[in-house]
């Protein structure tokens, strides 16, 4: 259950994020997306009651194990692709795909959670839809940093970041210095470890393309990646 204080929501101008999170979980009924069971409020608090995920979040497993095998990463990524496909079909960009926002159920399947930064009401065919600068620095796509405006393609870039972190234990381009990190994201080619299979390297290169129009998923969404 997530408990939100109304004074903090209003004081920090977070109303739209709380509403978006409730809306996204309410409209989606996908097996790989955390569902909202109940939503209610008292005088000073909002309550979002979500399904229980006993497996914890993916970041805890990465911290404990450093990285995952390609087979294990493939399983997680496959389920996440299906979840993103469902969101996109409902006109929603996730925009905050990272290990912290992926939880595991009782048998180890993935579920996406934390939709406060999602963008609703996406019109198919529009080139540039959202312009918000949002998300954790290491998980920003080039078009978000440059504030070009972004569409659903941003989620496929973040899928590449997530896959890279699963396989290597750290996001691509990472640096503790924000300015260097942004420069790396915008200018540097992704460094692919030799121990990765050719298929994994190819997928990472195509997902992490800096030009969203040339990125894998640009034409046919999830169908291009499956």
Task: Indicate where each model-derived feature is located.
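Conserved end of the kinase activation segment
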Residues: 143-153
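Conserved short submotifs of the Hanks-type protein kinase catalytic core
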Residues: 44-57, 61
């Amino acid at each position: 259950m997530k408990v939100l204080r109304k004074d903090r929501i209003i004081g920090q101008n977070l109303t739209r994020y709380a509403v978006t999170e409730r809306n996204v979980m309410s409209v989606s009924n996908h097996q790989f997306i955390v569902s909202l069971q109940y939503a209610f409020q008292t005088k000073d608090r909002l309550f979002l009651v979500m399904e229980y995920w006993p497996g914890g979040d993916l970041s805890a497993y990465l911290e404990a194990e450093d990285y995952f095998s390609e087979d294990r990463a493939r399983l997680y990524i496959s389920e996440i692709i299906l979840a993103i496909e469902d969101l996109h079909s409902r006109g929603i960009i996730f925009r905050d795909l990272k290990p912290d926002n992926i939880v595991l159920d009782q048998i180890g399947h993935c579920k996406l959670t934390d939709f406060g930064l999602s963008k609703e009401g996406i019109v198919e065919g529009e080139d540039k839809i959202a312009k918000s600068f949002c998300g954790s620095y290491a998980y920003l796509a080039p078009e978000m940093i440059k504030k070009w405006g972004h569409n659903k393609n941003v989620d496929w870039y973040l899928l590449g970041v997530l896959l890279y972190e699963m396989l290597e234990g750290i996001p691509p381009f990472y640096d503790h210095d924000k300015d260097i990190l942004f420069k790396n994201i915008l200018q540097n080619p992704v460094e692919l470890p030799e121990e990765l299979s050719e298929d994994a390297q190819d997928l990472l290169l195509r997902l992490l393309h800096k030009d969203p129009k040339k990125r894998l998923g640009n034409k046919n969404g999830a169908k291009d990646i499956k």
